């Protein structure tokens, strides 16, 4: 039997105690071990015959295609998307430079290559005039007025702002429940500040689950990139620049506010 998540030795100690107390016999343990060894020995030949090489570039291209087909366009006011040639674009948001592309916890894997949206925008050949980047906010939610001021200053120089927001690895991970459905307060404050000086804001949202969107009226476009994998940023760039058309659909119902959800009356209670 495979036990997940890893028990950290608790189950081993329980088994040792059970053997000493006579509740479990060594023959019982041997029988379970034989089953595991049978699996190991019966699959060894197949593993040995498995291909030892693979095409990393082809895998990355497939990942980019899969991510692009999953991206959801939630809003596009005044046809602000796709971005247009000659348009002065400011990229703001920590997720543009350090992508949130996968879940946190035991699901995390080491990708051979990970796209960053900032690099993809800089390398784009659509004729967009990139005017600069600002992180805009602390990724883990701490207030940082200086970063926000830098972002607002940059937003004033652009025709359009691409604002990369989302849930960080500490707010959304295996082993914990989210305390709410909201974006971090510092991200919402940044959106307010940027929209106050430049109404042409495109929000690209990175998150593995729904977030409430009472702030959606303060951006002209809202694109849900989910957790797009190693090539998710490149796929997002393809969508934003019009190389590909967004065709993804939501797999969950999104509420504008937590008050709109049926769970509002129960969430946050004590016990079960």
State where each predicted segment sits:
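Catalytic center-proximal scaffold of phosphoryl-transfer enzymes
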Residues: 5
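C-terminal non-catalytic regions of proteins with extracellular/luminal or membrane-system context
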Residues: 8-24, 38, 53-57, 61-272
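N-terminal small/glycine-rich loop or linker at the start of catalytic domains
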Residues: 9, 44-45
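Mid-to-C-terminal alpha-helical segments outside catalytic/metal-binding sites
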Residues: 26-44
